[in-house]
Amino acid sequence: MGTIRLMHAKLHRVRVSEANVDYVGSITIDRELIERVGILPLEEVDVVNLSNGKRFSTYVFPGHTGEICPNGGAALLCQPGDILIIYAYEQRPRQEVLEKGHFAKVLVADAENRCQQFFEQSLIPRGDGRGVEFSSQEC
């Protein structure tokens, strides 16, 4: 039946604190934020800039409290104050998702990149092995 790529973590509405074109690449993200949603250092992420519509993929470095810093080429796509959504995905066997479900952790940030809201989005198996129900619950 194959595999399916599902979101497992999302940082919603984080703000760029700085952009460093001279750094080696990546995006530096507040360590507490990535740990809260389960993103690992060096994990690939997709980034959507809500302030200008640009999108890019990169990898994560852990940073200091409040830090959201696109580095290298990604720094050319953002400027301080821009609002971003950062997604991380995992590849799962489709049948396993239908049988056991899936959940993703979502953190909504305030203007200082602190957790404003935290919740889980889940796929819950229907029991017939062919479908799932979607659920979203605040933690």
UniProtKB/Swiss-Prot annotation:
Chief localisation class: cytoplasm
UniProtKB keywords: Autocatalytic cleavage, Cytoplasm, Decarboxylase, Lyase, Pantothenate biosynthesis, Pyruvate, Schiff base, Zymogen
Signal sequence region: none
Molecular functions per Gene Ontology: aspartate 1-decarboxylase activity
One Pfam family recorded for the sequence: Asp_decarbox
UniProt cofactor(s): pyruvate
GO cellular component: cytosol
Active site residues according to the UniProt entry: S26 (schiff-base intermediate with substrate), Y59 (proton donor)
Record: residues binding substrate: T58, G72, G73, A74
Subcellular location: Cytoplasm
Biological process terms in GO annotation: alanine biosynthetic process; pantothenate biosynthetic process
PTM sites of type Pyruvic acid (Ser): S26
EC number assigned by the record: 4.1.1.11
Cofactor binding description: Binds 1 pyruvoyl group covalently per subunit.
Top EC class of this enzyme: lyase
Pathway(s) where this gene product acts: Cofactor biosynthesis; (R)-pantothenate biosynthesis; beta-alanine from L-aspartate: step 1/1
PTM per Swiss-Prot/TrEMBL: Is synthesized initially as an inactive proenzyme, which is activated by self-cleavage at a specific serine bond to produce a beta-subunit with a hydroxyl group at its C-terminus and an alpha-subunit with a pyruvoyl group at its N-terminus.
Stated family: Belongs to the PanD family.
Protein known as: Aspartate 1-decarboxylase
Name of encoding gene: panD
